[in-house]
C-alpha cells in the first residue's frame, strides 16, 4: 500500500493498480490513476512518459527503470520507429497483449479489442528461460510477487494476462472490452482506409477507427478470412484439466510438483495407478500456482468404464459434449488421479470455481491441431494496403504436454512486431512477407536448446534470438499469392489436411524402373535371370541373390543350388527380415505360386527404397547402404535383447540360475523369430493354409490388402487389429511381447508374468540367445550365414559367452539424453572387472548420475555452479525462493553431498542441482510427449495410406479390362504409397529407439536410487537378503549401462555411415 505519510492520492491509486487481481479492478484503478494525474488512458507511448514524469513515487521508480531500459533499446528508436502506423489487435490473451506491448514500444497507435470482460482461466503455462527473463524485464515481480519462486517455472494464464494488461495500459494501449471482431470492412473509395466490423454497438470512435495493420490473436477458432489452415491429426486424445483450491498451508507447500510423468517411459507408475484406482492415463502433470493445477491424458475406454462418458460416439464433438459427460464422475476421476499422484498429501481436494461458478474441471479433445499455412498476408483495395498477421493459437495450436504455447507464442509476437517495423520502414510488401515466412518456418523447430544461450540479449530483432538465421529462406517470388489485390480473384493454395510424413523421394516410381534395378542387382549370379516381377522369382534364387548382393556373407549362392523353391524363398525372407530389416509383406508360398504379384512388387520396392543409393555395378559390396531399414533392424534386435533381459529378470525373481556380474556382449547375427507356441493358433489352420499365410489377418481372419499387412513373428495382421490383448492399446514396434503360453500379444504394462517352471529350458535363463536355424530346420546343404557387416558375428556358444565390461565416459553420458548420440571415436580398453560387489557398485554409480541429468560434480564444477548462481540474471532481488524437498529427494541430495564433501562449502548448489534436475525431468517428459504425438500422427497417416492402397489394389484386381497404360499408372501410384509407408515405418522405428532410450534412462535412475539406499547402510547391519538384493540391483544396473552403450554405438555407426555416404556422393 501507499506510504502512511503520502498525501498524494495518485500514490494510493498506483498501489491499488499494482495489487489488483481482477480485470475490472485493474481497469478502474488505472482510470482513477489517470484521472488523478489529469490524463486520458490510451494515449500511446507519450502517455507513459507523462505518467512517469508526474508520478514521482518511490514505489514506482524500480518499475520505471525496467520499462525505460526496455524502451531504450536501439531497435525501438526511442519510440519513433512506427509513429505513423495504426494497429488493431484482436484478442487480449497472453500473445495478443504481448504483441500490443511491443507495438506500443515501437511508437505505433495500438487499439486492442476483447470480447470477454474478465480473466478467469486458472490453467498454468510452462515458461522457457527467455520468457522468464522477458517478463521480469517488464516488471513481473512488481506486479506478481510470487512470479517463478518454485522449482518449476510456470504462471497461470490469468496472472499472465493481468501482468501484461497492466504493462499495456501503462504504455498507452487503448483497450475495449466486451467487443467482438466479426470481420474486415474494406475501404469503399480511394482515400479511405480499412475498418473493423464489431459487435455489439461499438463506440463511434472505435467503429470509425482506420488502421493499416491487423494482428489476430483471437484463438484457434478464429482465423481471418484469406488464411489457409492445415490440420495435423493423430489418434483420439482426450485431455483433462482440473484446478483445486490452493489454501497455501504448510502441508500444501511441501508437496512436490510433477513436471511430467509419461507412460511411454514410466509404465510402472501408471500400472500402480490403474491397480489402485482403476484409472488409465497416458501422462499427468502437476503445477502449484494460484491453484493446484493438474492436466492429464485419459484413455477413452477407461472414461467409459468409470462412467465419465455416458456413451461411445465416433464423433469427438459428440463424445466430449456436455450432454455425454457426467460432471460428478469427471470430478471423482480427476480427484482420485490427483490424490494418487501426490500420495494424498494435499488433503481434501476442493475444486476451484470457473468463470461460470462451476467446478473448474473439463475434458477436451486434442486429437487434431491446426496450423496456419502462412503467418501473414497483405490485402489491398482502392490503393489502401492492410498488413495482416497471426499470433497465438490462430497461428499454431500448441500441443499442451510440451509446454511450448507461451514461449513460441511470444516468439511469434516478437516476429510479428518486427514485421510491422519493417512495414513501417517502407520495405517492399513481398519482401516483408518473405522475411516473416522465413521466421515462421523456424517456429515449430524452436526449443531452448537451439536458440541463443544468452537470453539477456533477446530483443525484437530476430538475429538476437535465432542462431544461423536466414531471412531469405523464403523468396519474395514464393509469397506472391499472399499479396491479395481484392479486384482480382485470390490464388487458392492446396490445403492438405493430413501430414503424411516424408515425401516419396527415391521411390521405385514405375514397374519398369523397379525391374531395371532388380536386374542390375542380380546380374552375374549363376542360375538367376530376372525378366519380370513375378515368375522370375518363383524358384527363390533371384531373391537370395538380391539379399546376397545387398549384404554379402548372409547367403552363398553356391549353397542354394538344388534347394526347393519354397525352402530357398522362406530362408531369404527370414534373413532379409533379421539382417536387413526388410519386413515381409508377402508369404513364401505366394512368391513361389505367383499368386500375389502386387505383394511381391511391394516387397521388392522396399529393397529399392532401403538400398537405392548402392552402386549399380554387379558383384558384392563391402558394406550395405544405410537405408530406411537400419532403424527397423536395430529396433528388432534391441527388442529381442530386452525380451531376453526381461526373461532373465523373471527367472531371477523366481529363484533361477546363478547370475553373472558381467553383461554378455550381444552379437546377434542370424536370429530367427521363435515359432509361436502351440496350443492357441492365431487363425484356424484351414484359413491359414488357404490364405497362403499372407492374405488373411491372423487375428480377425479378414482379407489383408498389400498396404495393410503388418508382419510380426511370421504372421500377418491388420495394423488396427494388432493391439494389446488386455487394454486394446496400439502396439508400437519395440513396445510389445508375445506371451508364450496363450500366444497373445501384450503391451509391456499388461504382459502376464511367465511361469518359468512350466516353460522348460527353451526360454529359461540357460538359453539367453534366441534359437538359430539348426541342421534340422535349415534346407539341406545350406550353412548358417556368416556375420553381417554391421558388426554382428557368429552366434556365441552359450557355454562360453563373450564377456566385456563397459564404462561410459562423461561425454557419452551427456549424449545419452540427446537424439544425436555421438560417442568419442577413441574408446579406452575395457577395464578389468572389480573384484568386489562394493567396488563394482561404486564403479557403476560413478559412471552415471542420470537421476539428476548431471554427471557427478567435482568441487571445481560446484564452484562454477556457485558462481553461475550469483551471476545469473534470475538472482539478486528476484531470486527464486528455496522450497522444501520431499524425503526421497532430500535423502539422495544429502547422501551425494556428504560423499562429495560439499554440503557446507557451497550453500547454493543444492537448490541449483534440484532445479536442474527438474529441468531435465521436464525435458525428458517433453521429448516423450513429442514422440507420442508424432507416433499418433504416423498412425493416422498410415491409416489414410492403407485406405488409398486398398482402393488402388481393388481397382487393379477387378478392372481386368482396363487399358494397360491405366494399370501401369495404378501400379506406379501403389509403389509411391508403399514408399511413403516404408518411410513412415522407418521414422516410427527411429522414434521407438528413442523411447527405449528414455525407458532405459528412467530405469537406470530408479536403480541408482535403489542401489544408493543399500550402499548407505552400514555393512554390519545388512542381512543376507539385503546383500542378495543389492547384488541383483547392481547386475541390473550394469545390464542397463550396456544396453545404453548399444544405443550409442548404433547411433554412431549410422552417423559414420551417413557421413561416408555423403562424402562419397560429393566425391
Curated annotation (Swiss-Prot):
Binding-site residues for FAD, renumbered to this chain: 95, 114-116, 121-123, 181, 293, 393
Domain bMERB: 918-1067
Effect recorded for residue 758 to K: Requires 2 nucleotide substitutions
Composition bias type Acidic residues, residue spans: 876-886
Positions of region (Monooxygenase domain): 1-489
Modified residues annotated as Phosphoserine in this record: 617, 872, 875-876, 1057
Composition-biased stretches (Pro residues): 671-684
Reactions catalysed according to its record: L-methionyl-[F-actin] + NADPH + O2 + H(+) = L-methionyl-(R)-S-oxide-[F-actin] + NADP(+) + H2O; NADPH + O2 + H(+) = H2O2 + NADP(+)
GO-annotated molecular function: actin binding; actin filament binding; F-actin monooxygenase activity; FAD binding; metal ion binding; monooxygenase activity; NAD(P)H oxidase H2O2-forming activity; NADPH oxidase H202-forming activity
Domain LIM zinc-binding: start-end pairs: 695-757
GO cellular component: actin cytoskeleton; actin filament; ciliary basal body; cilium; cytoplasm; cytosol; endosome membrane; hippocampal mossy fiber expansion
Protein name: [F-actin]-monooxygenase MICAL1
Species in which this protein is naturally found: Homo sapiens (Human)
Protein's gene: MICAL1
